[in-house]
């Protein structure tokens, strides 16, 4: 039977249960026990959007509330990307970039996407300093809470140093121009034009990415990662990256993908997107509990015993692009919240 996982994401936070085997012989120790089965079986994960969490939008404003999160039963904090946001090709309204806006004040109101990273080893100055972030992690550990970072491995922003120093780290067209991410099946752009697609056929780029991942575990003592668009990155890379991180300390890995083979060696948990869309369809009257029963039966055959299927009714992406809970499932949100607390996964 799958280990229990529970997720409730409302606005800028997520609750879930998660678990996986703990690697042996961690090479560093912290003020908190290693990530492991005993902890993760009943762990509540809280997704934090630092910019929107408080009026200040800073690490320090969030850190002061960590004792309150402990009182609420939170065991893992998932922090959305903390890196600086690219200014080159920063999106404005519609298809416009901020560079298309003549008025400087008009440009400044567009803050950019967390997922257009300009430097993997730097802190977004809007949030505070590296020391502020390290204090957040240390405070969490003192309160017996783990911290995982949201990471963007598929692409960078257009002013990332690699753009200028290592253009071969990126996917290029026939004219030798770096391109934004595209659908591998159709070749059409995903529309993420504020980002540049990374080239995972380049071994040097893979090594540099793993180095950046190791940096935050070693420097800030974080406890793992949530990997953005994990289905777009080769599984072999994640397997090597996770093995490298486990050499430093036990880590918890979450994949933003619904791809069971990711959990063989690389990840502890993946997204239950099919289940999420099924709940949306049920709330609209397009499907019923018969389809839900069929889905649950299928999961018993698809997932291995130690795989974790992350059930959720919303997250920061869905809230932004598909609609709020009040818009998508106004009459069912409380019922579905209770439902995900009772289902396996």
Where in this protein do the model-derived segments appear?
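Positively charged n-region of N-terminal signal peptides that target proteins for export
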Residues: 1-5, 20
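Structural recognition of the beta-strand scaffold that forms the well-ordered cores
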Residues: 44-47, 76-81, 148-149, 224-226, ...
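Active-site-proximal helices and loops of the catalytic beta/alpha 8
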Residues: 25-29, 212-214, 218, 223, ...
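Substrate-binding/active-site clefts of carbohydrate-active enzymes
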Residues: 31-46, 51-75, 81-220, 241-247
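Sec-dependent N-terminal signal peptides
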Residues: 5-14
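C-terminal motif of bacterial Sec signal peptides marking the signal peptidase cleavage site
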Residues: 16-18
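Active-site beta-loop-alpha junctions enriched in small/polar residues
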Residues: 51-53, 82, 152-154, 230-232, ...
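Active-site-proximal substrate-binding groove within the catalytic cores of carbohydrate-active enzymes
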Residues: 299-345
């Amino acid at each position: 039977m799958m280990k229990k996982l529970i997720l409730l994401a409302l606005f800028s936070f997520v609750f879930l249960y998660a678990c996986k085997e703990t690697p042996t012989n961690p090479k560093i120790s912290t003020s908190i026990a290693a990530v492991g089965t005993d902890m993760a079986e009943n762990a509540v994960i809280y997704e934090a959007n630092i910019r929107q969490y408080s009026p200040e939008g800073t690490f320090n404003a969030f850190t002061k509330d960590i004792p309150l999160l402990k009182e609420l039963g939170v065991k893992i904090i998932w922090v959305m990307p903390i890196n600086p946001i690219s200014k080159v090709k920063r999106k404005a309204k519609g298809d416009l970039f901020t560079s298309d806006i003549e008025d400087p004040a008009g440009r400044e109101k567009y803050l950019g996407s967390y997922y257009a990273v300009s430097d993997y080893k730097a802190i977004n100055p809007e949030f505070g300093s590296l020391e502020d972030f390290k204090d957040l992690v240390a405070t969490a550990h003192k309160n017996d809470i783990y911290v995982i970072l949201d990471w963007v491995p598929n692409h960078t922003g257009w002013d990332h140093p690699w753009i200028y120093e290592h253009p071969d780290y990126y996917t290029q067209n026939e004219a030798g121009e770096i391109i934004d991410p595209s659908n591998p099946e159709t070749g059409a752009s995903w529309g993420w034009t504020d980002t540049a697609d990374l080239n995972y056929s380049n071994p040097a780029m893979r090594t540099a990415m793993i180095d950046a991942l190791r940096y935050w575990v070693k420097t800030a003592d974080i406890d793992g990662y949530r990997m953005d668009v994990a289905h777009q990155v080769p599984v072999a890379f994640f397997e090597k990256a996770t093995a490298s991180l486990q050499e430093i300390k036990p880590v918890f890995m979450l994949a933003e993908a619904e791809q069971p083979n990711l959990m063989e060696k690389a990840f502890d948990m993946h997204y239950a997107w099919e289940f999420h869309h099924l709940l949306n369809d049920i709330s609209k009257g397009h499907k019923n509990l018969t389809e839900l029963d069929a889905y649950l039966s299928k999961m018993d055959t698809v997932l291995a015993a130690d795989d974790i299927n992350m059930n959720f009714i919303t997250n920061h992406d869905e809230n932004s692009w598909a609609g709020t809970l009040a818009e998508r499932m106004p009459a069912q949100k409380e019922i579905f919240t209770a439902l995900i607390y009772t289902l396996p996964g």
